[in-house]
């Protein structure tokens, strides 16, 4: 084929265009314009890393500042973990105007949820402890009522025994008063002298004491006692005046006597016993005796 016979007039002129060339309104290529490229080549690899670190540092500081602002608006404190997390999310997901507000709001919600969960757990534990205390209180109440019931029963028994003792003493005293009079003892004549005549002298033998009325308390010999012993003797005498059995009083130790008859009760009876005062003191001593029995039962 001859080169002179080829006709290129029908070819599209776009094929002749350069990718970087502009076009006129008639579709023909215009002046070629080249885009600007950064042709600065770092001298070393360290220069390139310094440029990247500089940009990263500035963006991290911006994230921290925005995070501080968002946290301040919602009243929470920014921690290192929050800052590192926000910077990592910024590099991976990007950042817009409300991103950190949502980030701080999410942290606030999570914190509140954890606090509420802990509060609910603490309240449940508190309810369990309250139930345990109620059960223990109920048990203590039952034990106290049982102890009070026993003390009342013992008090009634003691009062009955005191009444029996009083009746026995009164019966014994009545028997002594109603006993027949002592017969006239024989007169023994003693001759003093012939000139003085005879004089009569009556020698009365000693009166026998009923063995049932003898007790260790009444048979104690008189001795020099200390002030503590004299006070204890006064307390024992007060118990006897209150119709306590003498033999039982003799078996009490000084500690028991002081427990039954404290010094204030002895002082109350110092001016004498009226019927009302006697009953009052007797009731207090009975209550002390009940408490003593309860202590002995508990210790055993």
Curated annotation (Swiss-Prot):
Post-translational changes noted in the entry? Phosphorylated by host kinases.
Q: Where is this region: Disordered?
A: 1-59
User: What lineage does UniProt assign to this protein's organism?
Assistant: Viruses, Riboviria, Orthornavirae, Negarnaviricota, Haploviricotina
Listed Basic and acidic residues bias regions: 40-53
Q: Which UniProt keywords apply?
A: Chaperone, Host cytoplasm, Phosphoprotein, Viral RNA replication, Virion
Q: According to the UniProt entry, which residue ranges have a biased composition of type Polar residues?
A: 1-12
Q: How does it assemble?
A: Homotrimer when phosphorylated. This trimer is stabilized by binding to the L protein. Binds soluble protein N, and ribonucleocapsid.
Relate the protein's function as given in its record: Non catalytic polymerase cofactor and regulatory protein that plays a role in viral transcription and replication. Stabilizes the RNA polymerase L to the N-RNA template and binds the soluble protein N, preventing it from encapsidating non-genomic RNA.
According to the record, the segments passing through the membrane are none
GO terms for cellular component: host cell cytoplasm; virion component
Q: Which InterPro entries match?
A: PP_C_cytorhabdovirus (IPR048486)
Subcellular location as annotated: Virion; Host cytoplasm
What's this protein's name?
Answer: Phosphoprotein
